[in-house]
Amino acid sequence: MSIIKEFKEFAVKGNVMDLAIGVIIGGAFSKIVDSVVKDLIMPVIGVLTGGLDFSNKFVLLGQIPASFKGNPESFKDLQAAGVATFGYGSFITVLINFIILAFIIFLMVKFINKLRKPEEAAPAATPEDVLLLREIRDSLKQR
């Protein structure tokens, strides 16, 4: 088998297609999932937790410089100024994005796999002893 035929078989029949589909779908849905998390889920969680805004939750690790002109309670302002911060709220938001995106991709791959027809297995080769018995049978019939 030539290298090109082997590669074609690998690319078409292997997991490469599943991976490509996952990457394409993941890229297409990432903005939708970001919006669902940021605009729908996080506000509800904020209301349930008494107005908590996860995007602005952080721990200050360094000193705020004297020349800092932004809001000292704004994670984005502190990051822009280069102040060392531990942004756990942003991490929680990204983690929720990931979980939702992974679940959507899982459901889509599961659906695609249901649509695929199972490959027909090649018929098993007839064992040598069966072939020999057939030859003996045929030989006896001819006598």
UniProtKB/Swiss-Prot annotation:
User: Which keywords does the record carry?
Assistant: Cell inner membrane, Cell membrane, Ion channel, Ion transport, Membrane, Transmembrane, Transmembrane helix, Transport
GO (cellular component) term, any one: plasma membrane
GO MF annotations for this entry? mechanosensitive monoatomic ion channel activity
Reply yes or no: does the keyword Aminoacyl-tRNA synthetase apply.
no
Q: Write down the membrane topology.
A: Multi-pass membrane protein
TM spans (from-to) = 10-30, 89-109
Its localization reads: Cell inner membrane
Q: How is the quaternary structure described?
A: Homopentamer.
Relate the protein's function as given in its record. Channel that opens in response to stretch forces in the membrane lipid bilayer. May participate in the regulation of osmotic pressure changes within the cell.
* Family statement: Belongs to the MscL family.
Protein's name according to its UniProt entry:
Large-conductance mechanosensitive channel
Organism whose genome encodes this protein: Burkholderia mallei (strain ATCC 23344)
Which gene is the coding source of this polypeptide chain?
A: mscL
